[in-house]
Amino acid sequence: MLDKLDGALRFQQEALNLRAQRQEILSANIANADTPGFQARDIDFSSQLQKVMEQGRVNGSGMSLSLTAARHIPAQNIQPPDLDLLFRVPDQPSMDGNTVDMDRERTNFADNSLKYQTDLTILGGQIKGMMSVLQQG
């Protein structure tokens, strides 16, 4: 039964994890907008999500989870996926070699934030639906 619950929520969980990682990448781009020679990076979200869904996240050794009681269910190790970072090609190169376009970064940051909130809303709806089914018996 836990496998079915995990399968139902896994897609949204992976999407949220990738969106959070993308937000960190976009934040780093914005923070380094004035750094000479900094190369703006991003990920192809759809291909990364497909990659994560195909391979799963249970491979390798990630953070270890400890049991504090004998009746606890042991969890598998979790490891963040290896992201394929892409370097952004600037529309208009700068003299110092920095490829950060602040308009593009702010737009991508806001778009990613909105999609993150949408994913949270969808996940919350799925959990509420499961809770109502479990409570009704």
From Swiss-Prot:
Key words of the record: Bacterial flagellum
Its annotated compartments are:
Bacterial flagellum basal body
Q: Which domain of life is it from?
A: Bacteria
Primary localization class, coarse: other
What GO cellular component is one of the record's annotations? bacterial-type flagellum basal body, rod
Q: Which GO terms describe its biological process?
A: bacterial-type flagellum-dependent cell motility
Record InterPro entries: Flag_bb_rod_N, Flagellar_basal_body_rod_CS, FlgB
Question: Is Ribonucleoprotein among the key words of this record?
Answer: no
Which Pfam families is this protein grouped with? Flg_bb_rod (PF00460)
Job description of the protein: Structural component of flagellum, the bacterial motility apparatus. Part of the rod structure of flagellar basal body.
Return the similarity comment: Belongs to the flagella basal body rod proteins family.
Q: Which PANTHER family match?
A: FLAGELLAR BASAL BODY ROD PROTEIN FLGB (PTHR30435:SF12), FLAGELLAR PROTEIN (PTHR30435)
- Can you state the subunit structure given in the record? The basal body constitutes a major portion of the flagellar organelle and consists of a number of rings mounted on a central rod. In Gram-negative bacteria, at least four rings, L, P, S and M are present, whereas Gram-positive bacteria lack the L and P rings. The rod consists of about 26 subunits of FlgG in the distal portion, and FlgB, FlgC and FlgF build up the proximal portion of the rod with about 6 subunits each.
Per its record, how is this protein called by name? Answer: Flagellar basal body rod protein FlgB
Q: Which gene encodes it?
A: flgB
